[in-house]
Amino acid sequence: MKKISGGTAFYDGMWTTLDLLRRVKDSRKAIVVLTDGVDESLLDSGHERSDHSFEELLARVSEEDATIYPIYLNREEAELTSELKDPSTTERRRERIERRLKPNLTAHRQIEQLAEESAGSVFVVAGENELDGIYQRVAAELRLIYSLAYSSTNTTRDGKFRKINVAIKQEGAVVRTRRGYVSR
């Protein structure tokens, strides 16, 4: 991975992590990432961008056997959102805030998509003081994961995406699963 100076190559960092996890065999794979999710490509900063787009990363996540647990820590989003709600904020200031807020909101949606695509969960924290509890929740969730095997009657290995649906009858139980798999 090339070095990005002055910014965050979040997409490339996730891509490299998936490369490393691909080498791990016969084990449950999870990525726990503390991030604001803002990749340099979301900003007009003049810094070098990630080699991979979000769309490429999302497509790759759908093909990998790793669950992603983003821990979303973004003080700037919270501060800007609060300032937008302040009735004394001028219209001109509002426009500047909205421009600064846009990449944060996009990043937030993107990490939610990464978690959903991988059957993971997003944990939103306001500060570092919440991290111990969040890491404990992630560890507890990882201990409660059940794996199901599925063998399709369609044996064609054509590289196409195949949708699956998992449902349970137990009231109150939560199922998080991938939407499908790529036939290889």
Feature names for model-found ranges:
Residues 1-184:
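Scaffold/interface architecture of coatomer-like assemblies
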